[in-house]
Amino acid sequence: MNTGIPKRSARMDMGFYALNKLASAGIVVLLLSLLDWAWPSGADQASEWLGLYMPQEHWVYGYALTASLAADAILTFLPSLHKGKQAAVYGAVGFLFFALFTGGHPEQLWLRAAAGTLTLLLFLWGKHAFSSNSLATPFFALAVPLLCWVI
């Protein structure tokens, strides 16, 4: 039975998936930039607390995006899960990824892991919030990170 909805190709689905991930990263970059603008010494203070001294772009696009892709890969091997269980998987991946792979001082392990969990939960929110037919998706994927970088 034809429902009138055209079927998309696998390439188009992958493109929308990538755009969704970039939009989620854009939200995280925007929130970190707003925190940096509202509290100018906050970025240095947060880096000191976490024991990491890297630009926020590396944190978001290097670590968080990779961890989000790993969480999605794990979710593909599991049966369909409710949003709460998806959040648990994302949180666990964020916790482990940021605790184990970001280096830094071991004293800040729990803070890094908690920050990774919160960051990945924002990626999960973006996964559900950004749709393929919304203009907000390309805006947050492309325009917001560029504006945050320029300003």
Regions found by a protein language model. Name each.
Residues 1-2, 113:
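Disordered, low-complexity tails and leader-like regions
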Residues 2-101:
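Membrane-associated alpha-helix detector
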Residues 100-136:
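Membrane-helix boundary connector in multi-pass membrane proteins
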Residues 134-151:
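Final/C-terminal transmembrane alpha-helix of multipass membrane proteins
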